[in-house]
Amino acid sequence: MEEELLPVSMIRQYFFCPQIPYINLVLHVVEPETESMISGRMSHEKFRAQHLPREVKPRHIETEVPLSSPKLGLCGILDALVETVFGELVPCEMKNSSIGSGNPPLKDRAQLTAYAMLVEEQYRKTVKRGVLFYTEDGRKVVTGINESMRRLVVKAIREIRGIVEAERPPEKKNLSACASCWYSRICYSASSSLQTAHRVR
């Protein structure tokens, strides 16, 4: 029996907090869409040439690209795949957020790397870089796709599978984001309930 493919979004969620894949995939609880989420989704424009930094010169841009790989165990829809004038393939993702003058967070870089790996698998071409476009501040960031990040993604896939198979929540991280995270009301109760059950045994 083939394993169900993990959505690439789970990679991003895992690097934000490993509790979320547990809640989504084991407890089958997903954060309900808020008005701002719906508004953001409805206004989410397609990736265009003007979203690219100058060093990426497009010959062709394909948007909403479905990708999947039983070998990697991943599937997802890439915002855009750019073929440059030199024949290079560059995966691109739009984020409805801002990063100011800082570097893209690990969760975004890991998700982009996962998409790059899917592109490599499907198109049989090596991907050396990708682009992250942040809609709120207009930042266009070229991100290198390296072996270190590829290994990190493979490890994350393996660990997410382990979480699902064990049906046990991973250890909580002490994140400042917990206070504003919708899932905090579930992950705290789920973890404490499970710990209580184990003590009873």
Task: Name every feature range the model reports, one short phrase each.
Residues 4-11, 107, 169-176:
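Structural motif
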Residues 17, 76-101, 113-117:
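Conserved catalytic cores of phosphodiester-cleaving nucleases, focusing on short active-site segments
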Residues 60, 120-201:
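Metal-dependent nuclease catalytic regions and adjoining charged, substrate-binding loops involved
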Residues 100-104, 141-142:
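A generic structural signal for short coil/turn motifs at secondary-structure boundaries
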Residues 47-89:
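Active-site metal-binding core of divalent-cation-utilizing nuclease and nuclease-like domains
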Residues 3-4, 10, 104, 117, ...:
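Non-catalytic alpha-helical scaffolds and adjoining flexible linkers that form interface surfaces
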Residues 1-60:
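Charged, glycine-rich intrinsically disordered N-terminal tails and low-complexity linkers that flank
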Residues 105-111:
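Short, conserved glycine- and acidic-residue-centered signature motifs
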